[in-house]
């Protein structure tokens, strides 16, 4: 193995990951021109596997929040954060702690004025961790398990989840109104579809009831009358109280990798930031590119 190439690869990977770490992403978003907090209270709601780190960075950057809640996966709380209560809950299937912590968040944002700002920090895993079901919790857990076992992709999963929830599909933003929401989103889905990341609690929903019903039929979900009615009920399509800053995405990671390659003297070519397939298929694809360059007498790393 070429030791120099291996060292360069390690450097490129480290530089790329550093650019999309939660703390760096939050600092970047809070320093942007898009962040304009109101004159009133500042509340923080952080949800996802990176919620604690995002909240810790946000509070340090802002100096204070009036009140806050972190909802993250078991084992992911690293300590206390001033003014913030931290909860751990179930992932990838929501549990009673998910439901209880989400209820606390909803209570916190009740009766806010239009002078208040809700800083909403969202990362991967939010669909399970942030949940107030519109159907019995046990039924939601069973449907989630069936979708997981059936091989449903994240878009299919979240299309169903949004309609069975009081906080997903833009409904959390409605609960916060008339307060303004500044949402910082760490994207864990290719293409950054905002309404699908953590099932879009503060984003207008682009999916339809017809799509949800089709997915339910595809995976033969045993729906109660209550659940079936929820799937046909439409979600918010317009939200006027939300500003969203997407960061920490695959696109940003790819750009950081390109910059690191160039710094090391390579001529980088970004083939795609949307590759979605099995690892063996990706390996075959990259191998064919390497063979093409080798056949033309070109160097390729």
Per-segment meaning from a language model:
Residues 1-41, 45-46, 53, 77, ...:
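N-terminal amphipathic/basic leader segments beginning at the initiator methionine
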Residues 72-115, 155-156, 160-161:
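Glycine-rich oxoanion-binding loops at beta->alpha junctions
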Residues 292, 298-301:
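Conserved mixed alpha/beta catalytic, RNA-binding, or beta-rich assembly cores of soluble enzyme
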